[in-house]
Amino acid sequence: MQEFSLWCDFIERDFLENDFLKLINKGAICGATSNPSLFCEAITKSAFYKDEIAKLKGKKAKEIYETLALKDILQASSALMPLYEKDPNNGYISLEIDPFLEDDAPKSIDEAKRLFKTLNRPNVMIKVPASESGLEVVSALTKASIPVNATLVFSPKIARKTAQILAKEAQKRAVISVFVSRFDKEIDPLVPKNLQAKSGIINATECYYQINQHANKLTSALFASTGVKSNTLAKGYYIKALCFKNSINTAPLEALNAYLLDPNTEYQTPLKITEIEAFKKELKACNIDLENTAQKLLKEGLIAFKQSFEKLLSSF
């Protein structure tokens, strides 16, 4: 069984050349993730891409994006490679496929295989949304021995289904990215104070149980969206609450740094299934169903990544 580990949910050229290396060298992180929104934020706001973008002028927008993004992914891969070589459970960087291909499994599979072949690094994970068509992609990629990060998982049912697919096919490392804080942002305005800032953690815990029950030893739960979205919570709140054995937490820098500075970090015991069910009954009394919320958040997440990718491409 793997222990709890931290990954960094951020990617940007200057960061990769400086603080990213420091975090790795001091043993703070052992992996990293990226997504279309992070690349949009980095490439459109950082000055470190401007000269390269200027040199690529005249090329198609997606070609410019891939040139920039793959360079960052390769740099992250190189920095993490010593960790991977020491322990192939660690040292991964994730790259997401074009979000506009999300509902086209054959094209998604082709793009994922092309990107993985182009990068030619064993510690690169291809990130695929766990939508209905996305799970077809997950299955195909695992059959092709490509490490997979199944992302935008909000539902325990989808967590179980994804874990079962990976258990059948996965010959390489895989993670199932369970999104956390978006639940609380959605639900907290609708519930009394004693139920606030709990839905994301409790839903993620149920997903964690499903993954550990149905996945193989190469697959781990990865808690994502663990930056706080409320000023009333400590920055490392979600990392600390979900510090479970055999799990990973990928966090934005603010949350990551807060957690690393916290002297009181230790393994947490996940809530019992009976406690989870009791909480869900309390939500039901407020006319809230976590499964319905999960479906809504998945749709919103898919749209948000498409919007970010479109914004990035149009900036070229």
UniProtKB/Swiss-Prot annotation:
Q: Which reaction does it catalyse?
A: D-sedoheptulose 7-phosphate + D-glyceraldehyde 3-phosphate = D-erythrose 4-phosphate + beta-D-fructose 6-phosphate
What is the E.C. number? 2.2.1.2
UniProt-recorded Gene Ontology molecular function terms:
transaldolase activity
Q: Cellular location of this protein?
A: Cytoplasm
Which keywords label this protein? Cytoplasm, Pentose shunt, Schiff base, Transferase
InterPro entries membership: Aldolase_TIM, TAL/FSA, Transaldolase_2, Transaldolase_AS
Q: What does this protein do?
A: Transaldolase is important for the balance of metabolites in the pentose-phosphate pathway.
Spell out the protein name for this chain.
Transaldolase
What gene name is listed for this protein? tal
